[in-house]
């Protein structure tokens, strides 16, 4: 069978299903892929058990089960992630193994919002999932229209509580199971849901269109030419002649001009996100720049030392700690290319954190580093990873 050609003319977005256990996330995922395949003949119709039997993957030493499903609407191509267990969601969202441009929150109309509904909304907020669309599932089991309205209001209030625009979020009522069984009325609801997703979740800005940033991996000097910083361009583009800022691990940011861009020993006019390059920097001494700093477009990213984060602590089985840790614990925080020591403060009422738990915490680093909300990091102890986290708010 010939491989289907990937249609680049359509925009692409990464989404996922979130919500409480047994509210119908996987059934909905199967229903979306099936209904869209039936409508356009494109993509693959996935059955529930194909999605539910997701293989385990290891992402930075953390074991996660995730199902990856792809499908397309008339205007967009989607990569959709669905996780079998609650712990998999927590790990997935915190490590960024599954980056989501938006999420479909599945709430059973028969049960209303439950503890994990709340937890997934909070996680979405903390890890920076920007948009949520709601699917009220199992509506075929609820006869009372008023009850449906009540559940919808509850979900909207819950979203508002975590700073999502609860009043404006699209809410679609349906039944994933009925749609999967081929009931035309409920298939229509799936199309209505995807129309809402198409419209409400904006096409993400591509990495190449964002402002330039490159973490410095290595530095060396070329006699007669100057200092070269090497690394992989994380986002944006850099051209010969561009002014860049060197950020982190120093009192003041310094500016310099890129006088040459090299890749695979060849000279380039410019480099973009994904390229592994060497950037020749004007007037920068070998000791003025080091691994762990970043080069960035001036004024686009700032150095910080204190932030709030959402963290997953590896279990003993994943190679993590065997014992809990407490406030004032001082591990290394590995940002992009380097370790920086930091002190942890746990939230009020949290005595300690056990291996396998996830928690919010405040971190204070001993030196500043270029960070933003959404920056990912690992927590390490003597070179082994004991946790994975994401910056949720910067405090100073």
Swiss-Prot record:
<dbReference type="InterPro" id="IPR033720">
    <property type="entry name" value="EFTU_2"/>
</dbReference>
<feature type="binding site">
    <location>
        <begin position="137"/>
        <end position="140"/>
    </location>
    <ligand>
        <name>GTP</name>
    </ligand>
</feature>
<dbReference type="GO" id="GO:0005829">
    <property type="term" value="C:cytosol"/>
</dbReference>
<dbReference type="GO" id="GO:0003746">
    <property type="term" value="F:translation elongation factor activity"/>
</dbReference>
<keyword id="KW-0479">Metal-binding</keyword>
<dbReference type="InterPro" id="IPR027417">
    <property type="entry name" value="P-loop_NTPase"/>
</dbReference>
<keyword id="KW-0648">Protein biosynthesis</keyword>
<dbReference type="InterPro" id="IPR004161">
    <property type="entry name" value="EFTu-like_2"/>
</dbReference>
<keyword id="KW-0963">Cytoplasm</keyword>
<keyword id="KW-0547">Nucleotide-binding</keyword>
<feature type="region of interest" description="G5">
    <location>
        <begin position="175"/>
        <end position="177"/>
    </location>
</feature>
<keyword id="KW-0251">Elongation factor</keyword>
<feature type="domain" description="tr-type G">
    <location>
        <begin position="10"/>
        <end position="205"/>
    </location>
</feature>
<protein>
    <recommendedName>
        <fullName>Elongation factor Tu</fullName>
        <ecNumber>3.6.5.3</ecNumber>
    </recommendedName>
</protein>
<dbReference type="InterPro" id="IPR050055">
    <property type="entry name" value="EF-Tu_GTPase"/>
</dbReference>
<dbReference type="GO" id="GO:0005525">
    <property type="term" value="F:GTP binding"/>
</dbReference>
<dbReference type="Pfam" id="PF03143">
    <property type="entry name" value="GTP_EFTU_D3"/>
</dbReference>
<comment type="subunit">
    <text>Monomer.</text>
</comment>
<feature type="binding site">
    <location>
        <begin position="19"/>
        <end position="26"/>
    </location>
    <ligand>
        <name>GTP</name>
    </ligand>
</feature>
<feature type="region of interest" description="G3">
    <location>
        <begin position="82"/>
        <end position="85"/>
    </location>
</feature>
<dbReference type="InterPro" id="IPR009000">
    <property type="entry name" value="Transl_B-barrel_sf"/>
</dbReference>
<feature type="binding site">
    <location>
        <begin position="82"/>
        <end position="86"/>
    </location>
    <ligand>
        <name>GTP</name>
    </ligand>
</feature>
<dbReference type="InterPro" id="IPR000795">
    <property type="entry name" value="T_Tr_GTP-bd_dom"/>
</dbReference>
<feature type="region of interest" description="G4">
    <location>
        <begin position="137"/>
        <end position="140"/>
    </location>
</feature>
<feature type="region of interest" description="G1">
    <location>
        <begin position="19"/>
        <end position="26"/>
    </location>
</feature>
<dbReference type="GO" id="GO:0003924">
    <property type="term" value="F:GTPase activity"/>
</dbReference>
<feature type="region of interest" description="G2">
    <location>
        <begin position="61"/>
        <end position="65"/>
    </location>
</feature>
<dbReference type="Pfam" id="PF00009">
    <property type="entry name" value="GTP_EFTU"/>
</dbReference>
<keyword id="KW-0378">Hydrolase</keyword>
<comment type="function">
    <text>GTP hydrolase that promotes the GTP-dependent binding of aminoacyl-tRNA to the A-site of ribosomes during protein biosynthesis.</text>
</comment>
<dbReference type="Pfam" id="PF03144">
    <property type="entry name" value="GTP_EFTU_D2"/>
</dbReference>
<comment type="similarity">
    <text>Belongs to the TRAFAC class translation factor GTPase superfamily. Classic translation factor GTPase family. EF-Tu/EF-1A subfamily.</text>
</comment>
<dbReference type="InterPro" id="IPR031157">
    <property type="entry name" value="G_TR_CS"/>
</dbReference>
<dbReference type="InterPro" id="IPR009001">
    <property type="entry name" value="Transl_elong_EF1A/Init_IF2_C"/>
</dbReference>
<dbReference type="InterPro" id="IPR005225">
    <property type="entry name" value="Small_GTP-bd"/>
</dbReference>
<keyword id="KW-0342">GTP-binding</keyword>
<dbReference type="InterPro" id="IPR004541">
    <property type="entry name" value="Transl_elong_EFTu/EF1A_bac/org"/>
</dbReference>
<dbReference type="InterPro" id="IPR004160">
    <property type="entry name" value="Transl_elong_EFTu/EF1A_C"/>
</dbReference>
<dbReference type="InterPro" id="IPR041709">
    <property type="entry name" value="EF-Tu_GTP-bd"/>
</dbReference>
<feature type="binding site">
    <location>
        <position position="26"/>
    </location>
    <ligand>
        <name>Mg(2+)</name>
    </ligand>
</feature>
<keyword id="KW-0460">Magnesium</keyword>
């Amino acid at each position: 069978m010939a491989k289907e050609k990937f249609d680049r003319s359509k925009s692409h977005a990464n989404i996922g299903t979130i919500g409480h256990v047994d509210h119908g996330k996987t059934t909905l995922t199967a229903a979306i892929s099936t209904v869209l395949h039936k409508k356009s003949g494109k993509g693959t119709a996935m059955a529930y058990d194909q999605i539910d039997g997701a293989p385990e993957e290891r992402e930075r030493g953390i074991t996660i089960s995730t199902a990856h499903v792809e499908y397309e609407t008339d205007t967009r191509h989607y990569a959709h992630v669905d996780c079998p267990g609650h712990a998999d969601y927590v790990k997935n969202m915190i490590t960024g193994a599954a980056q989501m441009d938006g999420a479909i929150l599945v709430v059973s109309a028969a049960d209303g919002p439950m503890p994990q509904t709340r937890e997934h909304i909070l996680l979405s907020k903390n890890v920076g999932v920007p948009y949520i669309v709601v699917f009220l599932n199992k509506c075929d089991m609820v006869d009372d229209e008023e009850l449906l309205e009540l559940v919808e209001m509850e979900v909207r209030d819950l979203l508002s509580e975590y700073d999502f625009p609860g009043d404006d979020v699209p809410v679609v009522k349906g039944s994933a199971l009925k749609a999967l069984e081929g009931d035309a009325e409920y298939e229509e609801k799936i199309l209505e849901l995807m129309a809402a997703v198409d419209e409400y979740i904006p096409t993400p800005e591509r990495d190449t269109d964002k402002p330039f940033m490159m973490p410095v991996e290595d530095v060396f000097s070329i006699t007669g030419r100057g200092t070269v910083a090497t690394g992989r361009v994380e986002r944006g583009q850099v051209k010969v002649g561009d002014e860049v800022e060197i950020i982190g691990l120093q009192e003041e940011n310094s500016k310099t001009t890129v006088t040459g861009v090299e890749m695979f020993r060849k000279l380039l006019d410019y480099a973009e996100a994904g390229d592994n390059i060497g950037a020749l920097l004007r007037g920068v001494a070998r000791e003025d720049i080091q691994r762990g700093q970043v080069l960035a477009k001036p004024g686009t990213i700032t150095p910080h030392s204190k932030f709030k984060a959402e963290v997953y602590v590896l279990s003993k089985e994943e190679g993590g700690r065997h014992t809990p840790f407490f406030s004032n614990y001082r591990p290394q925080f590995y940002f992009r290319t380097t370790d920086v020591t930091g002190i942890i403060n746990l939230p009020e009422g949290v005595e300690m954190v056990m291996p396998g738990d996830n928690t919010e915490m405040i971190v204070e680093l001993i030196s500043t580093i270029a960070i933003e909300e959404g920056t990912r990091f690992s927590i390490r102890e003597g070179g082994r990873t004991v946790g994975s986290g994401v910056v949720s708010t910067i405090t100073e």
